[in-house]
């Protein structure tokens, strides 16, 4: 744990839940950057670049604000893509694209690549890392896909799926479920520890 206040630079309900489950008390701030303006063909590089951009956008906002507590905080920003059969997938842009994503996971697993940037705002120390987890699926029924898309959550998730809604269709998981959710538990804890020293 850390004695400093924590800021999660994300509006993701799944990342929030991971931090809550880890026992942290924190506030959230949304970076509001144009992620599509940042491109790279390597998933690790792409997620690191986007995570850094989120952190820089929030750092600028915090430094310009009058909130002294924020200026003494530790900030966590992360980004996730899903790699499917060598192709990077971000959030689906249409329901049809989401449907195609979900139908494809029985043939190749979803590989979550998540980069995390942690900043000690007061000292300026920045650390970062990347974690990978692979989720295998069995065939997802068309009826269930319709239901998922109608609920809407999957439209806001890299790769167009949420493991917590798809337990009946998941097979082997290699790595941490928190990485699939968008915030690797072990990596995040280690990075927070590094900037807290």
Curated annotation (Swiss-Prot):
Q: Which major enzyme category is it? A: hydrolase
- Provide a GO biological process annotation: nucleotide metabolic process
Chief location of this protein within or outside the cell:
cytoplasm
**Keyword Nuclease set for record:** no
Which GO molecular-function terms appear in the entry? Answer: nucleoside triphosphate diphosphatase activity
Q: Which residues form the active site?
A: 79 (proton acceptor)
Site feature Important for substrate specificity: at which residues? 14, 80, 164
Reaction(s) catalyzed by this protein?
N(7)-methyl-GTP + H2O = N(7)-methyl-GMP + diphosphate + H(+)
**Can you name this protein?**
7-methyl-GTP pyrophosphatase
| Organism of origin | Dictyostelium discoideum
């Amino acid at each position: 744990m850390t004695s400093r206040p924590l800021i999660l630079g994300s509006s993701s309900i799944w990342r929030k839940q991971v931090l809550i489950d880890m026992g942290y008390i924190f506030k959230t701030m949304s970076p509001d950057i144009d992620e599509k303006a940042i491109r790279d063909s390597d998933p690790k590089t792409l997620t690191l670049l986007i995570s850094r951009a989120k952190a820089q956008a929030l750092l600028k906002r915090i430094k310009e604000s009058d909130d002294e507590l924020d200026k003494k905080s530790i900030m966590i920003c992360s980004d996730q893509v899903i790699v499917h059969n060598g192709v990077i997938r971000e959030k689906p842009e249409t329901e049809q694209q989401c449907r195609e994503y979900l139908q494809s996971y029985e043939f190749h697993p979803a590989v979550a690549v998540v980069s995390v940037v942690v900043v000690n705002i007061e000292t300026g120390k920045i650390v970062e890392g990347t974690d990978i987890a692979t989720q295998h699926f069995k065939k997802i029924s068309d009826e269930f896909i319709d239901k998922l898309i109608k609920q809407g959550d999957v439209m806001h998730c890299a790769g167009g799926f949420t493991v917590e809604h798809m337990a009946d269709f998941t097979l082997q998981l290699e790595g941490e479920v928190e990485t699939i959710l968008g915030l690797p538990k072990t990596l995040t804890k280690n990075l927070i520890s590094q900037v807290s020293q």
